């Protein structure tokens, strides 16, 4: 059965698991309005009911094709519409990508995420990334791809190649979507999410805060994510990285407590999803990150670069995790890869 964009929106009577519900925007905004420590406490309780609170999923994100994107996303330095001095590059060589994945695994990452600056891939691009996915899967890692909007059959091809997750963010509140992006619609995002779900892929879907939105608009973003049916397996929460030359370079700074509130509300409304601290973490003090982990964040991007912007270095993350008595979630490979690891005794070194 085809999953249509409308079918992805959760209905009040549609409850695929006991903790799912339909979230009205006003109800999500009410959560945002709780006293700060009460909200964090509630989120921490929900988190402990669904996850080991000491486990953190480590993912590495690599830009395999950088710059020259035809989309005009106001936050993105890779857009060809913005003067950010970021040139258009060709896709990385397959062997180079696989070598990056090997390094990521040796340093503790269990998931390897690949991004390409496309509006959407061409059929020949899908063939190329499928070969990359197969090679990375052969290392015993989970794979995630973010390649833009997909045409019919592409999600199935990626699934057949071994892709585990497809990232396709909803970016912001649907009501202000075209204030941020003019070259596509919110409905276009929903269409690709429908194709991804129909192919049997897991969904990584989140958004960006700190783009001059109101609290009510942050609530709208979280409600739109929580009402996806089923809810995303991974929810990246990005804090805007302001890049000179983009329309949002002078955006007002988002108060750190408001970011923690966003993480908390995401955890409460999406109790079984991995909530990932994504872009903007390099500007977050350790205490702020610790509060986010308390509030239910249980995944980070690991490595000193996220596509084109900075990220905390690996040594710093190791030290922080040791301070907080956290440890990395290990991905358990299946099939032939699992047998090889079992026989060799080789595991990720963390």
Swiss-Prot record:
Keyword Cell inner membrane: no
Molecular function terms from GO: 2 iron, 2 sulfur cluster binding; 4 iron, 4 sulfur cluster binding; biotin synthase activity; iron ion binding
EC assignment: 2.8.1.6
InterPro entries: Aldolase_TIM, BATS_dom, Biotin_synth/BioAB, Biotin_synthase, Elp3/MiaA/NifB-like_rSAM, rSAM
Keywords for the protein's UniProt record, in alphabetical order: 2Fe-2S, 4Fe-4S, Biotin biosynthesis, Iron, Iron-sulfur, Metal-binding, S-adenosyl-L-methionine, Transferase
Record field: catalytic activity: (4R,5S)-dethiobiotin + (sulfur carrier)-SH + 2 reduced [2Fe-2S]-[ferredoxin] + 2 S-adenosyl-L-methionine = (sulfur carrier)-H + biotin + 2 5'-deoxyadenosine + 2 L-methionine + 2 oxidized [2Fe-2S]-[ferredoxin]
Binding residues annotated for [4Fe-4S] cluster, in chain numbering: 69, 73, 76
Pathway: Cofactor biosynthesis; biotin biosynthesis; biotin from 7,8-diaminononanoate: step 2/2
Cofactor(s) the protein requires to work: [4Fe-4S] cluster; [2Fe-2S] cluster
A GO BP annotation: biotin biosynthetic process
Binding site for [2Fe-2S] cluster: 113, 144, 204, 276
Domain of life, per lineage: Bacteria
Cofactor binding: number and manner: Binds 1 [4Fe-4S] cluster. The cluster is coordinated with 3 cysteines and an exchangeable S-adenosyl-L-methionine.
Subunit (UniProt): Homodimer.
UniProt xrefs under HAMAP family: BioB
Homology family: Belongs to the radical SAM superfamily. Biotin synthase family.
Protein name as catalogued: Biotin synthase
Organism: Neisseria gonorrhoeae (strain ATCC 700825 / FA 1090)
């Amino acid at each position: 059965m085809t999953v249509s964009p409308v079918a992805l929106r959760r209905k009040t009577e549609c409850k695929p698991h006991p903790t799912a519900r339909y979230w009205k925007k006003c109800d999500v905004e009410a959560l945002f309005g709780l006293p700060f420590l009460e909200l964090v406490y509630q989120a921490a309780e929900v988190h402990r009911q669904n996850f080991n609170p000491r486990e953190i999923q480590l993912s590495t994100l690599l830009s395999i094709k950088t710059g020259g994107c035809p989309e005009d996303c106001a936050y993105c330095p890779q857009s060809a519409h913005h003067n950010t001095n970021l040139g258009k590059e060709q896709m990385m060589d397959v062997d180079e990508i696989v070598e990056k994945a090997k390094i990521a695994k040796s340093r503790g990452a269990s998931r390897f995420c690949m991004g390409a600056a496309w509006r959407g891939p061409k059929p020949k691009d899908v063939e190329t990334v499928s070969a990359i996915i197969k090679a990375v899967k052969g290392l015993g890692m989970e794979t995630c791809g973010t390649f833009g909007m997909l045409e019919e059959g592409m999600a199935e091809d990626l699934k057949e190649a071994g892709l585990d997750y497809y990232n396709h963010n909803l970016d912001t509140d649907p009501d202000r979507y075209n204030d941020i992006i003019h070259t596509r619609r919110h409905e276009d995002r929903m269409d690709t999410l429908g194709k991804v779900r129909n192919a049997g892929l897991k969904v990584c879907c989140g958004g960006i805060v700190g783009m001059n939105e109101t609290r009510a608009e942050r609530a709208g973003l979280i409600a739109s994510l929580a009402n996806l049916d089923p809810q995303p397996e991974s929810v990246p929460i990005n804090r805007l990285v302001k890049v000179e030359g983009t329309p949002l370079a002078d955006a007002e700074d988002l108060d750190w407590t408001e970011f923690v509130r966003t993480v908390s509300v995401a955890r409460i409304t999406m109790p079984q999803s991995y909530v990932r601290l994504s872009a903007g973490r390099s500007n977050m003090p350790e205490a702020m990150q610790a509060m986010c982990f308390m509030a239910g964040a249980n995944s980070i991007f690991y490595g000193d670069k996220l596509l084109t912007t900075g990220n905390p270095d690996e040594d710093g993350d190791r030290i922080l995790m040791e301070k907080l008595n956290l440890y990395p979630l290990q991905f358990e490979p299946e099939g032939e890869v699992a047998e090889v690891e079992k026989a060799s005794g080789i595991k990720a070194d963390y």
